[in-house]
Amino acid sequence: MIGCLSLARETFDIKFANNKLVKTKNIIKKLNRNFIFFEDLITNDDIGKNALKFFEKNKCTKFIVLQSTFTDAKFISSFVKKFKKPILFISFKERRAGGRLRLNSLCGVNLALHSLVKNKFYSNFIIYSNNEENLSKELLRFINISHTLPKKNYLKKTSISKKTSKKIVSFKKPNLGIIGERPEGFDTCDFNNK
């Protein structure tokens, strides 16, 4: 069985996120596979706890996570530590309209993947841009993968051009520090002074 869940924050356009969620669920259901959905948008700790209990009762071999809006990585980090199963994230492409993004789901996926990679858990994501055929193809590829967890990150390394290696700003006595602790779920803000 493959578990499906959706992450969101109420500070974003929840109505728009729910519309994307319904469309994506319908595409997933058309694949005629053994899927089980946690129906509620996971928007807070209490709903997150309910999702954990739901998937404890409904054993899954893989998970599809719909990153409906931006979220921090708090829930998904604890979810992965608990279940340790392959995950495919789906983010939603949205047009820039000159202001704040309505969903900003790709940024949520980026934060989640960074947190997971720091904990040596490698995953993948796809961006759904209203092309049902491509989404179905990518979902089937994930479903049919024979191995359980990727052993490495598949992001390509890029080289820095020599033209950009010159100093842009020169500091006489540079200092870097951190005041307080990072917010929970924002592992990208970790600081190591060694």
Regions found by a protein language model. Give the residues of each.
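An N-terminal assembly and electron-transfer interface module characteristic of large anaerobic redox
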Residues: 1-194
